[in-house]
Amino acid sequence: MSRYRFRKARSNWPMGQNDSRWEPPPVRLNELVTATEPEEIPLPKLEDQPYEGGPLNMTGFMYHPRTKKYYKMTQDPTMPQGFSKSDLDRMEKAREAKFQANRPRFTSGSFIQRPVFKPITTLMDDLTLGRCTMARVERHIHESRLLNCNPKPSFTIKTPIEHYDVSGCEFLDVSETGDRIVGTFTVNPNGVAAKHSAVYVFEVDSIGDTIQSESSRREAYQLLPIRSRSNNAGFNTLGLTVRPMLRDDGFSDEPSYLDYAVTRYNSFIVDQTLARVDADVTCMLTVTANDTITRNGNVCSYCTVHLEPLAELSDPEAMPTLNSPIYNKSWREKGNIWSVGWNAPQMSIGFGLESCFRVENLLTDRSFLMSSRKRNVLNHCFSADGNLVYMGLRNDNVIKSDLRMNRDHITGQLNGACNTTFVRVLEKTRPECVVTEGFDSIIRIWDFRWPKNPMMEMHGHSNNCNRLNVFFDKEERFVFAAGSDGYVRGWSLTSGDMLCSVKTPNHSNPIFPRAVYSDCWGGRPGNSAIIMAVGDSMRVHSLEL
């Protein structure tokens, strides 16, 4: 026996009187060993029992305190999945990263984070510490207001046209000061007169006493129990009053309500826009269409462009000059006129025709034609200096034409901007960029220096081959569009995110809703709201932090 095997064999021998090194023999198979003390299984403590929700109060999850994991409650208990708080945070970050990766971005690479609601204290701290500028603080405040937009209107105002039944709104705009609303409404007289369209100018005022009384009434209503609250018509916390501006000259014996309307049209309205002819006078450009039967029995279509002054939006000192021929003109065109636009620097009017584009000078009465690639000019707009015109064509891209050239006016196009029904230049913020909207239900921001791809895309809009209402605020921070599905949506022109989506009542008439936005309604800064003209009412959605 080797020395190693001998040491291993005697390792279990008892060594003298010391039994500490002695090891008991191993238990053999099927040998019974009597236990000296019974084994007791300790019960789990009450604080270690799993319970629903956990510290995060997550519905649908069970929380285990010992493992610190969340288990999703399912109908099949054999397939549980445990998630810790770090797992949930990681999943949320992955979801947010995927969402940010799929968002449209600027082609230059610069990108601003998705707007979220920020308290005033956080914004002021960032401003004090120099982490943001004052312009960004203002933008965050307005975006937070839009993010808090309630789908239900704060209150509803019946369109103040007492002697007619209003069918819908065809045009709506607001002044920069927020104290005037210009609208074209389709009205049905109560008498024997036929259905027609009328232009009205409303005065918007904000009354302080109404603000205090309505705010107190809303606070008392919110203190009531939910079951005790009755249906109310809303709370006019902005103190808004909308009244028509009467045109009573004092010489007519007829009632003043007959002169409510600025003008009336018995023909179909194709397009309308406001034209600031000079610093004192504001006019309205309107395109109407009607059909006539010739002597041979053929149906012939004619379009007429009307230029009419709006005394309510003009300077009171310019009243004696409103009857001047330069402010009251009309042009009759055989064929279709799809769009009309005003070029203020050159005092000219643009007509989007069936197969070309026409420019009419208001001072010299001279006109010339420009190529539109033999396409219908669905919409157009002029640049801030008046030298360029951007045209949205049917079945073709948006083109840019230079008015200073004698021939070959087309100098550029946007690849992918097809069937564009709305074109607008961002004159105040980005004069080199245009915003387009078309039949593909996508609102895009383009730069003609990089015409192959848009700078930004805003999704969620709905358009089914209609010319819909698109509105910009005076600071060009937001864009609002009424969709063919009855929703009015708003996007941020800085980040491209949708900030609000409001569903309007579904009416049987084919007139789509119109929406305007202002942050100084009634001439009071801070009165921020969206007004939607739907049917015979104006739905006011007040925006609060």
From Swiss-Prot:
Pfam families: Beta-prop_DCAF4. Residues 1-25 are annotated as: Disordered. Residues 1-10 have a biased composition (Basic residues). It comes from the Eukaryota. Coiled coil: none annotated. GO terms for cellular component: Cul4-RING E3 ubiquitin ligase complex. Gene3D superfamilies: YVTN repeat-like/Quinoprotein amine dehydrogenase. SUPFAM superfamilies: WD40 repeat-like. WD repeats lie at residues 417-456, 460-501. Keywords: Repeat, WD repeat. This is Uncharacterized WD repeat-containing protein F47D12.9.
